[in-house]
Amino acid sequence: MDKKRIFIVDDESGFTRLLKLTLEKSGNYEVLEENDGTKAWLKAREFKPDIIFLDIVMPKIDGGDVAQQIRSDPLLAKVTIIFLTAIVSRTETTHDIGGFPFLAKPVSLDAITRCITEHLAA
């Protein structure tokens, strides 16, 4: 079975490192992390992920702009993007952040793995 590729873009390096190590430990995923949103699009092109977890609020460029770059790239246009954010409540809908699914921070590992499973099964 091929490992699914997960790309985590978040300026909180401790969070991305922990998530990467935990997901890779399962043996099911190959994980790439990036803490600089300005590098995310090019890294995504190289890595060709199945799912991108993308923080909305980052220095230099926000997740919404990164998502637009990814969506406008024919190579990446169909990749699942899931926003990670602390700026919305758990009761808001995905339409409140541009129609993308999201997980509200702080997010549990269980919520991340459930989200991965659901989106890879779709």
Where are these regions (language model features)?
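Active-site residues of response regulator receiver
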Residues: 10, 55
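Two-component/phosphorelay signaling modules centered on CheY-like receiver
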Residues: 13-32
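Conserved Asp/Asn-Gly motif in the active-site loop of CheY-like receiver
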Residues: 34-38
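Active-site beta3 strand of CheY-like receiver
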Residues: 47-53
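Receiver (REC) domain active-site loop signature in two-component systems and cognate sites
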Residues: 58
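Hydrophobic/aromatic residues positioned on beta-strands within the core alpha/beta folds
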Residues: 82-84
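C-terminal output helix
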Residues: 107-118
